[in-house]
Amino acid sequence: PKDVNELKPYYLAWQGGDWANRTQCMVAGTNDWRQNHAAYNRGEMDKWAMANTPYSIGYVHEADIPVQYKLAEAFTVGDMYYESIMSSTAPNRVSWFSGTINPPKGSKVNGTNKHMGGPTLDNRDSVGCERTDSGKPFSCVPLRWKTVPEYLQEAGISWRVYQDKDNFGDDPLVMWKQYQTSAKKKGDLAQRGTSFPGLQKFFDDARDGKLPEVSYIVAPMQLSEHPPYMPMDGAWIQGEVAKAVMHGKNWDSTALIYSYDETGGWADHVVSPYPPQSEESEWIEDPYDKSNGITPIGPGFRLPFYIVSPWT
C-alpha cells in the first residue's frame, strides 16, 4: 500500500461482512522457485510482501476453515512439517512419490539429467529439458528413476492411487517413463498408479475393508483448494475421506495422513532446517537467477499436516 514501508501479518477478512467468503478464493501469491527463494532471502525470510505479494502474509481464523481445523484439533498435528522442495507443485509431488528430484550433484540416480530426467524444479511436464544460460539441462522429462510405489510392490506391499479423471494433473507418476510404457501395455504399474478408479472406489473400499496397504488420494481440481478453488470446497473431501475411513472395517489399523504438496504462496516466518552446503545433493546453482549462487533445494516452508487414526 502507498506510504507503507512495513507490513505485518493480518487477518485476510478484516473488513468483515461477506469478506470471509470473498477471501476463500483469493490467490496468496505464487509458489514457484523464483518467488519462494526470493522471499526466503538466504534464511532472512523477510521478502514475502515484496518478492511475492502483500497477500502472502495474511491469515485466516478457525471459523474460515472449520472442518480442517476440527480434524487437526482432534488428532495429531505435525507443526514442523515442511514441503520437500522450495518450489511449486510438480517438484514436491515428484519428491513425494520418489524421494528425490534428481539433483545434478550427489544424486543416487545413475545417469545424466538429460537421460534420467530432472532435476525437477518447476511444473514442466512436456518431453525435453529446460536449460540455464550456460546450457545446463534441468526439469527434463520423462523421468526414469525408481518410484516409491515400485519399491512397495517389490516388497509385496499393496498400493493404489485413487483419483478421478479431473485430477488437476496432480498425479506425477505420469511423468515417469516406466508408467508411460506400462499404460501402453495396460500393465500393473499403470493400473495401480495412473488409471482413474474414482474416489467412489476409495469410499467403497474403505467401507468394505478392501483398501490396499498404502493408498494415495489425488483430489479433483474443484476440491484441491488451489485458488480459485476454496478451502470450504476442500473441506468436503477431507471430511468425506475421514468418515469413510472411520466407518470402515479397517479403522482400527489405519493411519490417514493429510497434507498439501506446497505452500500456495503463503508466507512463513520459520526457517526450514536445510542441510549444510557440504551435502551437495541438497544444494544447486540457481538456474533462474545467477545472483543467488548456490542455494538450497529444500526443505521449503511449513505445510499443514495431520494424522487421523485411532492411535493419534
Question: Model regions: which residues?
Answer:
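N-terminal pro-sequences and low-complexity stem/linker regions of secreted or lumenal proteins
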Residues: 1-312
